[in-house]
């Protein structure tokens, strides 16, 4: 359980599974069975780039300023707990996700929209670059093993979400499904945030 690979997988999975604009878009594409592979690939490759940037950048920062780790660690813990509380609020008041119309959309339009959901969301930089970078660098020489775990979680999540959505078409239009998923996310995020403050 203390393996950087496992910790990286769990940390990334906990963050990435929060239902936001990007995941809702991937889910809709999966439910509609439209351009699923390119969307999953774009999301995964984007995370690989962002995770690597976070690990590389924070490695240099912490090498020059070791005390910065404490600031990032407690800031990250507060962010995780806050995000967990937001997930708990969504679980309290879930909303069904209804697939939109049946008119096919061109691949280029879908990819541009997916890129916008990915890179125009400020949380992607906080989650993927800042927070995962800081968590990875707690493992010093094994930070890239943490990164490998995080990248694996990203690939598993987006592939499962995109390709699994078509099979769960009826389930994810039900608000109760969001309640369960967001409830689990809330528990995992708050637990990870608390663990950061005590390590």
From Swiss-Prot:
One of its GO terms (molecular function) is amino acid transmembrane transporter activity. It is found in: Cell inner membrane. The chain crosses the membrane at residues 6-26, 42-62, 68-88, 144-164, 178-198. Induction: Positively regulated by LysG in the presence of lysine or histidine. InterPro entries: LeuE-type (IPR001123), Lys/arg_exporter (IPR004777). It is a multi-pass membrane protein. One of its GO terms (cellular component) is plasma membrane. The keyword Glycoprotein does not apply. GO terms for biological process: amino acid transport. Keywords: Amino-acid transport, Cell inner membrane, Cell membrane, Membrane, Transmembrane, Transmembrane helix, Transport. The keyword Cell membrane applies. Belongs to the LysE/ArgO transporter (TC 2.A.75) family. Catalyzes the efflux of L-lysine. This is Lysine exporter LysE. It comes from Mycobacterium tuberculosis (strain ATCC 25618 / H37Rv). The lineage of its organism: Bacteria, Bacillati, Actinomycetota, Actinomycetes, Mycobacteriales. The gene is lysE.
